[in-house]
C-alpha cells in the first residue's frame, strides 16, 4: 500500500525551501524504496489567493482523505501575517490533527556550525536537546478571552491559561518516553511559583514520573530555564513544557544551533501522525523570492517525518548524514555563513544535499 504525503508549500519563503526538501524526499523515496506518493495543495497566504481563506475545507478534507491510512502531512509557511487574512482568524497549530498534538523540536548543533552560534563554541559543542511542547491547550486556546472597553474609557484585555489533568498527563508521558530512549533525563518547565495551572502541571508530572523510575526528573521555572539555555544548555536532554513556554523556549534554542534555519519540528498526535515544518514558520518574508533562504531545517523536517511517522530510521539517518557532509564541504547559506566558507543559495544548498545523499 502506498504512503500518502500532502505537501503544502505555503507562501513567503515556503515554496523555495519546500522545493529543496521535496528533492531530498524524492531521492530518499527512490533510494530506499519507501513507496511514497506526493500530493500538493495550498496553505496560508497562497490559500487566501486561491480559496479566499488560509486553510480551505477542501484542503483539510483532502489531507484526511488522501492521507488515509497514513495521514502524514508536510507543510511550510502558514502566512500568519498575510495581508487580507480574515480579521480575527487565528490559525490552529495543527489543523489536520485527529487528536491531541505535541511538538518535538530537536536542538542539535552540528559541529561545523559551532562558530555560527552566538555562544562560545565550548558552551554549545556537542549540544543535543529535545523540546517537547504541548500544542493544543494552554493560553493560546483558552477561554474566556476578551478585549473590551471599561466604563472609564480605558481598554482592557485578558486571556485564560487552562490545563486539565489528562492534557498534562498525556504530554508528560510523551516527554518521559522520549527521555527514556535518549539520555534518561527529563526537565519539566513551568511557573509553579505563581500560576495555578503550573502547580497542577508539576503535580501531574510527578505522578507520571512514578511509572518511569529509570528517568531522572527535574523541575525548572521557565524564567530560569530561559537563562540556563544560554548559560549551560548541555545540562538539558529532554524538556517538556506547555504551549506558550515551549513556543518561546524553542525559538530561543534555535539560536543555539547557529540559526533558526537549522531547526526542524513536528506536530504529532498520539499515533505519530504528523505535520512537519521548519521552526521558523512564515518568517523572513523580506527575502522571499530571492533564493537565499536556508532550506536545511525543512530538509531535516523530512528526516523527522521518516523517523517519527514512518519508522524509516535508515533513510532518516542518511538525510542527516548528507546535511553534515554538505556542511563539511564548507557550503553555507547567509544565515550560517562564516569566514572561510562558501556562501550558496537555497537551490544550490538543496542540490548539494541531494548529491551527498546519493553517495551514501
Curated annotation (Swiss-Prot):
GO biological process assignments: L-leucine biosynthetic process
Known cofactor(s): Mg(2+); Mn(2+)
Region described as Disordered: 66-101
Localisation: Cytoplasm
MF annotations from Gene Ontology: 3-isopropylmalate dehydrogenase activity; magnesium ion binding; NAD binding
Site label Important for catalysis, positions: 140, 191
Keyword Transcription regulation in annotation: no
UniProt xrefs under SUPFAM superfamilies: Isocitrate/Isopropylmalate dehydrogenase-like (SSF53659)
Glycoprotein in keyword set: no
Pathway info: Amino-acid biosynthesis; L-leucine biosynthesis; L-leucine from 3-methyl-2-oxobutanoate: step 3/4
Catalytic activity, EC: 1.1.1.85
Compositionally skewed regions (Basic residues) per UniProt: 66-75
One GO CC annotation: cytosol
Entry keywords, A to Z: Amino-acid biosynthesis, Branched-chain amino acid biosynthesis, Cytoplasm, Leucine biosynthesis, Magnesium, Manganese, Metal-binding, NAD, Oxidoreductase
Residues that, per the record, bind Mg(2+): 223, 247, 251
Its job: Catalyzes the oxidation of 3-carboxy-2-hydroxy-4-methylpentanoate (3-isopropylmalate) to 3-carboxy-4-methyl-2-oxopentanoate. The product decarboxylates to 4-methyl-2 oxopentanoate.
HAMAP family with a match to the protein in the record: LeuB_type1
Subunit and interaction comment: Homodimer.
PANTHER family xrefs: 3-ISOPROPYLMALATE DEHYDROGENASE (PTHR42979:SF1)
Protein name: 3-isopropylmalate dehydrogenase
Source organism of the structure: Azotobacter vinelandii
Amino acid at each position: 500500500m502506498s504512503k500518502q504525503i500532502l505537501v503544502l508549500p505555503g507562501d513567503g519563503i515556503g515554496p523555495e525551501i519546500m522545493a529543496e526538501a521535496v528533492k531530498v524526499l524524492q531521492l530518499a523515496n527512490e533510494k530506499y524504496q519507501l513507496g511514497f506518493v506526493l500530493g500538493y495543495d495550498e496553505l496560508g497566504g497562497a490559500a487566501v489567493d486561491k480559496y479566499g481563506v488560509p486553510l480551505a475545507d477542501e484542503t483539510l478534507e483532502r489531507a484526511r482523505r488522501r492521507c488515509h491510512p497514513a495521514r502524514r502531512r508536510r507543510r511550510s509557511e502558514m502566512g500568519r501575517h498575510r495581508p487580507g487574512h480574515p480579521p480575527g482568524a487565528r490559525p490552529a497549530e495543527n489543523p489536520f490533527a485527529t487528536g491531541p498534538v505535541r511538538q518535538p523540536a530537536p536542538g542539535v548543533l552540528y559541529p561545523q556550525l559551532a562558530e555560527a552560534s552566538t555562544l562560545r563554541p565550548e558552551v554549545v559543542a556537542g549540544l543535543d536537546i529535545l523540546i517537547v511542547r504541548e500544542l493544543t491547550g494552554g493560553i493560546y486556546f483558552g477561554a474566556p478571552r476578551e478585549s473590551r472597553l471599561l466604563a472609564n474609557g480605558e481598554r482592557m484585555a485578558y486571556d485564560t491559561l487552562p490545563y486539565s489533568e489528562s492534557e498534562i498527563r498525556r504530554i508528560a508521558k510523551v516527554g518521559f518516553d522520549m527521555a527514556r530512549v535518549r539520555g534518561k533525563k527529563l526537565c519539566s518547565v513551568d511557573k509553579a511559583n505563581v500560576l495555578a495551572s503550573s502547580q497542577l502541571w508539576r503535580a501531574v508530572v510527578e505522578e507520571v514520573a512514578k511509572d518511569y523510575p529509570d528517568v531522572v526528573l527535574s523541575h525548572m521555572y521557565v524564567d530560569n530555564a530561559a537563562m540556563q539555555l544560554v548559560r549551560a544548555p548541555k545540562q538539558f536532554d529532554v524538556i517538556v513544557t506547555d504551549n506558550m513556554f515551549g513556543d518561546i523556549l524553542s525559538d530561543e534554542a534555535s539560536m543555539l544551533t547557529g540559526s533558526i534555519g537549522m531547526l526542524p519540528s513536528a506536530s504529532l498526535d498520539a499515533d505519530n501522525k504528523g505535520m512537519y515544518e521548519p521552526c521558523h514558520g512564515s518568517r523572513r518574508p523580506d527575502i522571499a523570492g530571492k533564493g537565499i533562504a536556508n532550506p536545511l531545517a525543512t530538509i531535516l523536517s523530512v528526516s523527522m517525518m521518516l523517523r517519527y511517522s514512518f519508522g524509516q530510521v535508515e533513510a532518516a539517518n542518511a538525510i542527516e548524514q548528507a546535511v553534515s557532509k554538505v556542511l563539511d564541504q564548507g557550503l553555507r547559506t547567509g544565515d550560517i555563513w562564516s569566514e572561510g566558507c562558501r556562501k550558496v543559495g537555497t537551490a544550490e544548498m538543496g542540490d548539494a544535499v541531494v548529491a551527498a545523499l546519493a553517495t551514501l
